[in-house]
Amino acid sequence: MRPDCTDFRQLFLDDVPMMDMRAPVEFAKGAFPGVVNLPLMNDQERQKVGTCYKQQGQAAAIALGHQLVSGATKQARLEAWAAFAKAHPDGYLYCFRGGLRSQIVQGWLRDEAGIQYPRVKGGYKAMRTFLLETTQQAVEQCDFVLVGGLTGTGKTDVLHQLDNVLDLEGHANHRGSSFGKRATAQPAQIDFENQLAIDVLKKRARGIGQFVLEDEGRIVGSCTVPLELYQGMQHYPLVWLEDSFTNRVERILRDYVVNLSAEFKAVHGEEDGPRLFAERMLQSMANIYKRLGGERHQRLSEMLREALQEQQRSGAVDLHRGWIEGLLNEYYDPMYAYQRAAKAERIEFAGDAVEVREYLKARALRQPRK
């Protein structure tokens, strides 16, 4: 039999298949990419066992657990675990601390299905701690540079052309602005942190010692950038991306109207997609009411509403340029100009997309690999 695992680094570097014995409510709060939740107990069973443990102690709780997970229920779960083990002979199982739940499942697989299947020692908690430390160590040991620029300059497009990027918006499934929500939900906070840490781990394993980040706020939609990383972002050097006003308007039209409306259709269907897209856009505009002020918000909202109606009627998106131009001129550009002035001392290079991309590639070559 393969031994139980304590090499968390290799588990994540190799995307080793794992099954999680925790209850669905625990799994939903945070898990690891690609892991399958095949719980020993469902949420209701776990709650009953937990209450029993508090009132009557461990022995009574274990006895109740065996009573709840028995007969056809036990058989169905055993078949699911066995199927996973056979499909992934190189995998592992784990529970919260790598203790009783995973040991019980190991024993049932061995005794009743004839399958020897190893567990991850320390379980979810130990792997989670390892990933938190991975991010912390990168902040302490690696070099970082930020890419900033006015809204619509194509910062994400440039980042995706680099091999040393940490895509905070990608991991958060959010574009980072007031209009940044996607058609699909954002990950749980812990999932966001875990995905980011695994990205760091894999890139460092390839010898990357310098990372490029987009200049973000602490909050990306509903996801919060890890504190140690965000604190570093307040003093990392900054590269400023520039582009013409016309190009920026067209890029925003592409990303936030054409592509996003298509995304809503793909996810929610031809009938519900356009309606949900329109509701999302109007809500995004409503979210910045206080920052826009009443008159300006009313005027831009009406322009957005007319553009959405025309898009739904004919498919044309031309009217969207009106509110985009207004929002840039009257809100985003003044705000970013103020932010740039405050960060001027940290800006080490400014240029268009090609110049910034080549500068960042050359910069990475000058840094020691770690």
From Swiss-Prot:
Q: Would you identify the family this protein belongs to, as annotated?
A: Belongs to the SelU family.
Q: Which GO terms describe its biological process?
A: tRNA wobble uridine modification
Which species is this UniProt entry from?
A: Pseudomonas putida (strain ATCC 47054 / DSM 6125 / CFBP 8728 / NCIMB 11950 / KT2440)
Taking every annotated instance into account, which residue ranges of this chain make up the domain Rhodanese?
Answer: 12-136
Xref: Gene3D superfamilies = Rhodanese-like domain
- Entry annotation: catalytic residues: C95
Subunit: Monomer.
Protein name per Swiss-Prot or TrEMBL: tRNA 2-selenouridine synthase
Keywords of this entry? Selenium, Transferase
Q: Which NCBIfam families match?
A: PRK11784.1-2, PRK11784.1-3, tRNA_sel_U_synt
Listed as disulfide-bonded, the cysteine pairs are: none
Source domain of life is Bacteria
**What exactly does this protein do?**
Involved in the post-transcriptional modification of the uridine at the wobble position (U34) of tRNA(Lys), tRNA(Glu) and tRNA(Gln). Catalyzes the conversion of 2-thiouridine (S2U-RNA) to 2-selenouridine (Se2U-RNA). Acts in a two-step process involving geranylation of 2-thiouridine (S2U) to S-geranyl-2-thiouridine (geS2U) and subsequent selenation of the latter derivative to 2-selenouridine (Se2U) in the tRNA chain.
Reactions performed catalytically: 5-methylaminomethyl-2-thiouridine(34) in tRNA + selenophosphate + (2E)-geranyl diphosphate + H2O + H(+) = 5-methylaminomethyl-2-selenouridine(34) in tRNA + (2E)-thiogeraniol + phosphate + diphosphate; 5-methylaminomethyl-2-thiouridine(34) in tRNA + (2E)-geranyl diphosphate = 5-methylaminomethyl-S-(2E)-geranyl-thiouridine(34) in tRNA + diphosphate; 5-methylaminomethyl-S-(2E)-geranyl-thiouridine(34) in tRNA + selenophosphate + H(+) = 5-methylaminomethyl-2-(Se-phospho)selenouridine(34) in tRNA + (2E)-thiogeraniol; 5-methylaminomethyl-2-(Se-phospho)selenouridine(34) in tRNA + H2O = 5-methylaminomethyl-2-selenouridine(34) in tRNA + phosphate
Enzyme class, UniProt record, top EC level: transferase
Record carries keyword Transferase: yes
Return one GO MF term.
Answer: transferase activity, transferring alkyl or aryl (other than methyl) groups
Coiled-coil segments on the chain, per record: none
Instruction: Give EC number(s), comma-separated.
Output: 2.9.1.3
